[in-house]
């Protein structure tokens, strides 16, 4: 996976005088699974459609497997796209839907039959070939849509929120199916979603987008454990990272809601009294038994989820905080607990949102 599959160089997109994609540079390794994730309107689908050739590039270049495809038609780019709407022909059987694109490309009948047979076997839809889309479940229709992409034998698969129309249980099973498909085929896959769970579970690398810009690129672990800024910290993770207003005291210490906490950072670019944000994920908080560095928190609501409780708390200065509580006696609403944070999981952000540690 060292060769480059897709390269985006200073990609820009404008609608009239409004620029919506602002000079994006990305190198996507061949055979990798990359997920574009971000809130609605961040530009992720627009970026995918530019790679597909369905949206004109205002400026910049797109390469696929070393070939400049910026001005090529979608059919000449070596890509296949899977949409959230399935885009199946209702009057055709599954077999005919799978074969349609190949017939339009004047592929020989024997080759069409072989590709349809192979794709239906991979997706386990052999028994559905004579049915029409209206006779299929949502998950089955999505498999057929993916099958239409597979038969084209593309260099790159593009997925635009393919699971958004499915219920929660089906989304889980289809995530597993898509991950298995990637392992079997080994093609480069670029996947767009607003669902961070899909991003974390499917991706080799995640690209977090906001307002047409890349906020961070990295492995799921890198993005989760070391978010580049407050936006990424708050977007990736469920529940989100606690981001608490704090004051820099110098010598690697901050004051959070009246309590002092140490953080592994030098005083570079910080002045005593500067406002900062102290970050801690819910699962990195624990009830402190006599530990010096702890924060009192009043429990407003305790959410019991079997092996885990989520404690929705309020600090002395009114800031909200969520803690994950896995062991020990039950904690009830109205009680006050002392919370601390794993030393190596404490994060500090500047007032303008940059990660400092």
Question: Locations of the language-model features?
Answer:
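Glycine/charge-rich catalytic "coupling/switch" loops of P-loop NTPases
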Residues: 253-301, 329-357
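ABC ATPase nucleotide-binding domain
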Residues: 7, 27, 63, 338-340
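Conserved ABC transporter NBD signature motif
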Residues: 60-68
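ABC ATPase nucleotide-binding domains
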Residues: 33, 74-231
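ABC ATPase nucleotide-binding domain helices that frame the ATP-binding cleft
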Residues: 45-48, 144
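The feature captures the beta-strand-to-loop junction immediately N-terminal to the Walker
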Residues: 37-39
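Helix-to-loop junction immediately C-terminal to a conserved catalytic motif
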Residues: 52
